[in-house]
Swiss-Prot record:
Principal localisation: membrane
GO CC, one annotated term: plasma membrane
Family statement drawn from the similarity comment of this UniProt entry: Belongs to the methyl-accepting chemotaxis (MCP) protein family.
CDD domains, A to Z: HAMP, MCP_signal
Protein name as it appears in the record: Methyl-accepting chemotaxis protein McpQ
Disruption phenotype: Deletion of the gene causes very strong reduction in the chemotaxis toward citrate/Mg(2+) complexes.
Domain HAMP: residue ranges: 309-361
Pfam families linked: HAMP, HBM, MCPsignal
Transmembrane segments: 18-38, 287-307
Length: 638
């Protein structure tokens, strides 16, 4: 059986083997998953049902609390809460009827639905009984008020008639009415059935006295008393109706309590039942999962063992064959009996072994030829290396000479450039000096012109000074004559006595003015004389300055001519320096180009030398490798 299975699997591809193994594992995993899924689904369903049952229990508790609140308060708010709780419970029970499949729990739900129906009926009866009770309470109030009002009127009438005895009978009846009313009020507020008989007895006693009262009072009060008796009869009937309504309310409330207990018990029983079903489903799910897991492990281990043997054994055979090839043994061949990927691998190993036999045989012959060729190449390479080394030495000498020449050319170019710069600077300075000399000539010529103008102005000033002197002579003569006239006038005034005193004063003033004028004229004459003397000296100096200025203009013109000659000479020097610098730069460029070419030749020589050395080294290495290959090829057994 195993041989047939091994042979069948040996012809199946590894891809299908692995697919079969992993597919089986995946199918088993899927089976376990479906089993767990089914168990979890069942448990979740039971949990949901338990949750819904707990909701029924919650609504039942809320219904009980609402019923207790309504029993204590009897108001609209508590009534609305009770109706809401009952509606929620009925809706939840109807919902659960479509979810429960177990007959026992379904029967319990039917029981709960019936209990809800009875509870609703009892609740309706409770509301009707409460309505009748409240109506009876209203009748009690109106009947009692009417009877008391009628008795009060009779009392007031009897009191006004001063019928004391009759009034006392009416007061006694009124007291009995109040007593009966008090008993009824106690009964209606307490709701105790024992108080009902006490209240009825009090009403009957008051009613008997009320009916006997018309015989004790005037006949005019008989109608009022009859109406009061009728009202008290209605009062008694209302008490009876109140008692009946109270009894019906208590009975309905008791039925509600009983049905609430039924609802709660049914919910508890359903909770216990569903819990048992859930636990059973959980146990069943655990059992199924355990069985499925054990089966999956067994089948998985079996598949893993079979597939592993189908893969490992041929791999080990192939590995041993590869190790023989690695050790150099090419004498043996691998026998192939499979058609899967591993069989194809073994066939490839067989073909590789045969190919290696042929390859190693060919390599052995080629290695011998390589060794002899490497020895010849090594000898040629040594000769080439010696020639390249000689070329390298000569090239280094040429490169050194070119470097020295390049440095000298650079120095010449640098000196020519410096000389050109110095000539350019000298040319600029000469041009600047020529310009300054031209400006100096112009300034000196303008100065000479101004000196001539100043000399002419000084001559004119001298002429004007002479004119001022003649005018001053006239003024001086006039002042002397005025002084003489003033002196004569003073003498004549003195001769005239008192009559000429005023004229004498004027003559004195005129004489004094003439004397000051004469003194001022003399001072101006002295100033004019000094001015004329200074003007004469300045005119003499200006003549000398004009002569010197003319000499300076002539010298400056000669200096300008010399600077212009220097400028032309420096410009010529600058042009020649520029030509020298240009030639030096061209020579420098050519020298650098030659130097680069020589350096390239030297680099090529270095590269050639290095290549020759590397070729020689490679030749030696090739010879060594040939020997080594011969040794390696010798390790293989063909």
């Amino acid at each position: 059986m195993y041989q047939w299975l091994a042979q069948s699997l040996g012809n199946v591809s590894v891809n299908r083997k692995l697919g079969l193994g992993f597919g089986l594992v995946l199918l088993l995993t899927l089976a376990i998953t479906l089993t767990g899924w089914h168990g979890m689904d069942s448990i979740i369903d039971r949990g949901d049902k338990l949750g819904n049952i707990s909701v029924i229990q919650q609504y039942t508790q809320e219904l009980r609390i609402a019923r207790q609140q309504y029993d204590r308060r009897r108001d609209d708010a508590s009534l609305a809460e009770l109706e809401k709780a009952l509606s929620n419970l009925d809706r939840q029970v109807q919902l659960m009827l479509g979810q429960i499949e177990q007959p026992a729990d379904h029967q319990r739900l039917e029981q709960q639905r019936e209990a809800v129906r009875i509870y609703q009926q009892a609740f309706n009866e409770l509301k009707q009984a409460d309505q009748r009770r409240e109506a009876s309470r209203d009748v009690l109030g109106s009947s009692a008020d009417k009877a008391v009002d009628l008795i009060g009127r009779v009392q007031r009438s009897l009191l006004q008639g001063a019928n004391i005895n009759q009034y006392q009978h009416a007061v006694d009846v009124s007291a009995l009415l109040q007593q009966a009313r008090f008993q009824v009020r106690g009964y209606t507020y307490s709701g105790n059935a024992d108080y009902q008989q006490t209240a009825l007895k009090a009403i009957d006693q008051a009613l008997a006295e009320l009916r006997a009262l018309p015989a004790k009072v005037p006949a005019e009060h008989a109608a009022s008393l009859d109406d009061a008796a009728t009202a008290m009869g209605g009062y008694r009937d209302a008490v009876t109706q109140f008692g009946n309504a109270q009894l019906a309310s208590e009975q309905a409330l008791q039925r509600m309590v009983e049905q609430g207990t039924v609802l709660l018990q049914a919910s508890q029983m359903m909770t216990a039942s569903q819990t048992e079903v859930r636990d059973a489903a959980a146990a069943q799910a655990k059992t199924l999962l355990t069985v499925a897991t054990v089966l999956a492990l067994a089948l998985g281990l079996l598949a893993a063992w079979a597939i592993t043997r189908q893969i490992i054994i041929p791999l080990r055979q192939t590995l041993r064959a590869a190790e023989r090839v690695a050790s150099g043994d090419l004498t043996q061949s691998l026998q192939v009996q499979r058609r899967d990927e591993l069989g194809q691998l073994q066939a490839s190993m067989h073909r590789m072994t045969q190919g290696l036999r042929e390859l190693i045989g060919g390599i052995g012959d080629g290695v011998t030829q390589i060794a002899s060729a490497a020895e010849e190449l090594s000898a040629v390479t040594e000769q080439t290396s010696a020639g390249v080394n000689n070329q390298k030495v000569e090239t280094d000498q040429v490169a050194t000479a070119m470097n020295q020449m390049t440095a000298t050319v650079h120095e010449v170019a640098r000196n020519a450039e410096q000389a050109s710069e110095a000539a350019l600077m000298a040319d600029q300075q000469a041009r600047e000096g020529d310009r300054v000399v031209g400006e100096a000539v112009a300034q000196i010529e303008r100065l000479a012109s101004e000196v001539v103008n100043s000399s002419e102005a000084m001559n004119l000033l001298k002429t004007e000074s002479d004119k001022i002197g003649s005018v001053l002579d006239v003024i001086k003569s006039v002042a002397q004559q005025t002084n003489l006239l003033a002196l004569n006038a003073a003498i004549e005034a003195a001769r005239a006595g008192e009559a000429g005193r005023g004229f004498a004063v004027v003559a004195d003033e005129v004489r004094s003015l003439a004397q000051r004028t004469q003194q001022s004229t003399e001072e101006i004459e002295e100033l004019i004389a000094g001015l004329q003397s200074g003007t004469q000296r300045v005119a003499s100096v200006m003549d000398n300055s004009r002569q010197l200025t003319d000499s300076s203009v002539e010298l400056t013109r000669r200096a300008g001519s010399s600077l212009e000659t220097i400028t032309r000479t420096v410009s010529s020097i600058q042009a020649m320096n520029q030509q020298i610098a240009t030639a030096a730069e061209e020579q420098t460029a050519v020298a650098e180009e030659i130097n680069r070419s020589v350096m390239n030749v030297r680099d090529i020589s270095d590269q050639t030398s290095a290549a020759s050395e590397e070729t020689a080294s490679s030749s030696v290495e090739l010879a060594r490798l040939g020997t080594h290959l011969q040794g390696l090829v010798g390790r293989f057994r063909l």
